[in-house]
Curated annotation (Swiss-Prot):
Name of this protein: Polyribonucleotide nucleotidyltransferase
UniProt binding sites for Mg(2+): 480, 486
Gene that produces this protein: pnp
InterPro entries (UniProt xref): ExoRNase_PH_dom1, ExoRNase_PH_dom2, ExoRNase_PH_dom2_sf, KH_dom, KH_dom_type_1, KH_dom_type_1_sf, NA-bd_OB-fold, PNPase
Broad class of where this protein is predominantly found: cytoplasm
Amino acid sequence: MKIGRDELVFETGFMAKQANGSVLATYGGSSVLATVCCSSNVREDLDFVPLSVEYNEKYYAAGKIPGGFIKREGKPKDKEILVSRLIDRPMRPLFDKRFGREIQVIPTTLATDQLNPPDIVGMNAAFTAVFLSDIPFNGPIAAVRMVYLNGKFIVNPSFEEIHDSDLDIVVAGSLNGITMVEGGANEVGEDILLSAIDGAHEYIKQICNAQKEFLDIVGKKEKLPLAFEEKIFEFKDELRDFVYADLKEACFVKGKLNRDKAITLLRNKSYEYFSSLEKLTDSNESLFHKAFDDFEKEIVRSSILNDNIRTDGRTPNEIRDIISEVDILSRTHGSALFTRGETQALAVTTLGTSIDEQIMDDIDGDKRLNFMLHYNFPPFSVGETGRLMTGRREIGHGHLAQRALESMVPGKNDFPYTIRVVSEVLESNGSSSMATVCAGSMSLMSAGVPVKGQVAGIAMGLISEGDKYVVLSDILGEEDHLGDMDFKVAGTKNGITGFQMDIKIENVTKDLMRDALEQARIGRIHILSIMNTVISNSRVGISKYAPKIVQLQIDIDKISLVIGSTGKTVKAITDEFEVKVQIEQNGKIILFGDDDFKMQKAKERIESIVREPKVGEIYEGTVKKINSFGAFIELTPAKEGFLSTRLKPRDSKYGSGRFGNSNRYSRFGGGGENIRGNAGLVRPPKLEEGQRIKVKIIDIDKFGKIDLEIVRDKDY
């Protein structure tokens, strides 16, 4: 089928035939093979879907060999993890928990044309492979990418179109509606985002219908059996009578930890009571806990839908109290602490040089990133113990926050620093990624990064039943877990910069999404107003602890002069002035260092190297060679002048003589003397090779030969 500029082709039955399902998807010149397998072991106690998605890209797909010492693909790159999450999130809710087997989906990029991104191809290959397999799956689903460029929407754009666009989103969904949206933007309005999602759904329906036709022809009609039937705790009514009234109070205790403690006490009390009645066994213990969870979910959702009261006492559109502070760490380049209710993020900005850029070696081509955001979620943030490690969740949340901020960060030409923002989540009760956006934005301003505007983020939720729904602003962790939709919106006062949405139900209407986006916009403006009372514009100047930068522009044909033979000249500048020198192909030179005076001297040295000499200019040169007629003085690595050492009258055609009068020589380090018996002649001072002397250009002939004279200190 034709989707955008190219045909999307699905093939099956000739590759990976031993898998439960396999599909080779091709779009343009990009091909991805997706397989799905399930284990033979069945577990009846699972209350989740044991799904793993391992998207991977092979270097041979782009005709490349991996860089570095190890010439084999290694652990998953961040990009592969992010694409795996894009595949996992819309697909996971469509598996039946009662299947009871581990499921593994492996999309492998086999070819890429460097024009069409393989991630969308991989998503559709994975969705189709699962749909055609014998694993129970409530499909079909499909995905497309939409961008907004020059006032038009483009489906499945090229890399170049993505780079130039104002909106870039990936949308997944079914025939009935949208299930996932993720992307970034350059301050676009809510209407543009909604139109992009609407347009994407039309293409998604085309792909879903093609999958259904494919299933009718080659798919496995007979599905594997479910491992168990859903069971209900046989004493559920008795449990309701025993605990429901107390649970209604416990669900609304103030404070996350206090609320969790109250609910846990009731759970334990109920467990002990039913155990004493010998109504709990190993076979129904999990059913007891599920029934208890169902009561909690019922109480919370009913309160929101019918009474507009949330577990912490807020109304649906109310945002938790916000406290912000900047510059709390004295030696860092920029820092900010953002606290919203029981969620707290500390963001620290560090400025570096081009040497600190992140080098990306992947099949889409080598890239250098000068803006990075890293998100850390330590176990103490939720009052637990655990390992300090970076998991898929941390990478995904960090990527979302980075996309929300990166359109506001200046380009390298305007701000030639490498920027790294690290977010440490110190407390978490919902929306830690959006707290990271807020803290990160203020931290950038604190560091003096000239961002285009302040960015705030907010997490929204949805509770629905039939045609009735309530949109929640600034959701808690439990509202995320018990709700029907989780979507995060980040942006400035002018528009959206980052967006992520996961929908757990079908038939989410356009009107509902419009209401949710408008409520998110109002919440975002409220948060921005509070942040702006702390810091509203970037600091003028950067931290004294950050590396200093001096820039200059030279002619391209003079780059070799600055570098010198085998890098000798640039190395000498680096060593003498303790600076780092970055030379770009367009003739732009950037100096990095810690000492302003030395940086300025280094700049002057480079300017003297590339400057065309003029009569009257003064240089501090080096004596390179001496002969019987005079000395050759190196003015720059590419320019030499000649200093005559022949006897000269005091008054020459140059006025005071090429070497000046005897008084001038007597003032030049004791050099210059009258010739005995001939007061009209003077002898120049003695020179040695390697000696540094101050000279003045007095003549340049038509062949470029430079004549010099010595200059006294007071003339320099």
